[in-house]
């Protein structure tokens, strides 16, 4: 991470309209970690054709009737589960990213969710988005991404189809006016 760019932890990363990478076209990611070694985020607007109840059943945890979607969190380690949630709770592998947003990777949170005693707000994803040292900074300087402050309401309560527009609207940007052609002034 260059000294000119502060951490992007607890920020949204929004794909510019000209970014045509199928893994990220039209996405909004929540950045969970960002340091000199790289960055890690979860795509929060790409639901898969699997419900949480299906995933919990595959893990033999029960949870029948939980209609919540499971998301494609990104192209890295797509077999690994990540739960963004609020509040923190007492799970084995949790990291507080912001006062109202945590990430957990341990099975105990899924067990609690199956029993109906999990966190109040959750987003379950398979896989994550990862960038090596300096890679994300270079992509941002090449106008592939817009960053803006994260908001837990957008992660947990905004419909998927509205997340990008809502996040950009919070900082005064109209997504529909963004150019699909990149460049530098």
Swiss-Prot record:
GO terms for cellular component: cytosol. It comes from the Bacteria. Belongs to the UPF0301 (AlgH) family. HAMAP family: UPF0301. This is UPF0301 protein HCH_00550. It comes from Hahella chejuensis (strain KCTC 2396). The lineage of its organism: Bacteria, Pseudomonadati, Pseudomonadota, Gammaproteobacteria, Oceanospirillales.
